[in-house]
Regions:
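Hydrophobic alpha-helical transmembrane segments of multi-pass integral membrane proteins
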Residues: 6-10, 35-51, 67-68, 125-132, ...
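Membrane-interface helix-cap regions at the ends of transmembrane helices
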Residues: 16, 20-27, 31, 45-61, ...
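Specific transmembrane alpha-helical segments of multi-pass solute transporters/efflux pumps
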Residues: 17-24, 56-94, 99-100, 136, ...
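Hydrophobic/aromatic residues within transmembrane alpha-helices
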Residues: 28, 37, 83, 113-115, ...
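Hydrophobic transmembrane alpha-helices of multi-pass small-molecule transport proteins
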Residues: 49, 68-73, 119-142, 252, ...
Length: 304
């Protein structure tokens, strides 16, 4: 196996790790609360990334990237994790996460709008299909049903709003990274910043004192932190040394992989209409990717 293929496989591992996050974060938050659970997870993830990357290159990171990148990164992670933590149940957590997975499509649309990215006609169905897919998912057992979709959103508007806002923020983060990062990686520092914010939120919340009193809870907390910390490290390695085109294409299947792993972790039976909607989200994102594939790409930051 060549070094490039090995690096690509390492990048693939990040996709699997990130896909497990919805299930593991939900389990931890069910036991520790939304604020306390995510604070524990991101603190542990920060330690893992510090062990991998350290902070020795911080002085070389552009200050504008540190500020805007850190602000957007922390905001996204807050929206993503809390949208799962605030969900009423496991099924809703999985449905909410599908809104978050609009970010690949939004990233490409933002690149077209703000980065002069060129695209062909496939961008039109590529932009429309994920919206239809999300509507299909939120329609529940009845599939594409606007009234049921609105009823589901009204049942817990905060979670759905956080997930959608998070997808917008991550697409913006990708644009900021391309313009300001100068090839530097500030993720370890950003995770520390995120963890601090989450502990502050927990301190001002009404959640009870943390009680981690079972091995399974420790295990799921570690798995979530491992998925975040090692996931970022593996992805960066894959992007730098592997086949970026293959990794970018594979990343668009995260919604399907995430839903599958979440259904196992949370013991859920997801309906046929849910899988149809999720498939449309992935297919639309793939069309957006294909619409720009033969053009000079301005996209260098792809995520979970």
């Amino acid at each position: 196996m060549t070094n490039k293929n090995r690096a690509t496989l390492i990048g693939f591992s990040a996709i699997l790790l990130w896909s497990s996050l919805v299930g593991t974060i939900r389990i931890v938050c069910e036991n520790l609360g939304a604020y306390g659970g995510v604070a524990v997870i991101y603190s542990a993830a920060s330690v893992i990334l510090l062990l991998i990357f350290g902070l020795k290159t911080i002085r070389h990171i552009p200050k504008r990237y540190l500020f805007w990148g850190g602000l957007l990164f922390a905001s996204y992670e807050l929206c993503f994790s809390l949208s799962i933590g605030f969900a009423n149940n496991g099924r809703q957590a999985v449905e909410v996460s599908m809104l978050n997975y609009l970010w690949p499509t939004l990233t490409i649309l933002f690149a077209i709008a703000f980065n002069n990215q060129k695209a062909n006609f496939l961008i039109i169905p590529g932009a429309i299909l994920p919206v239809i897919g999300i509507s299909w998912v939120l329609g529940g057992d009845q599939g594409l049903n606007p009234m049921m979709m609105l009823a589901n959103i009204q049942d817990n508007p905060l979670s759905y709003a956080l997930a959608f806002i998070g997808s917008l923020i991550w697409a913006s983060y990708c644009m900021v990274t391309v313009k300001l990062a100068d090839g530097k990686n500030g993720v370890a520092l950003f995770l520390i910043f995120t963890a601090i914010i989450m502990w502050v939120q927990y301190a001002f919340s009404s959640e009870p004192a943390l009680s981690i009193n079972s091995f399974s809870l420790i295990l799921y907390s570690f798995l979530a932190a491992f998925a975040i910390g090692v996931g970022y490290a593996a992805w960066n390695y894959g992007v730098f040394y592997g086949n970026v085109t293959i990794l970018a294409g594979a990343s668009y299947f995260i919604p399907i992989i995430s839903a599958f792993l979440s259904s196992i972790l949370l013991n859920l039976t997801l309906t046929y209409s849910f899988w149809q909607g999720t498939g449309l989200v992935c297919f639309g994102a793939m069309l957006c990717w294909l619409a720009t594939r033969n053009k000079k790409s301005h996209l260098k930051e792809i995520k979970q």
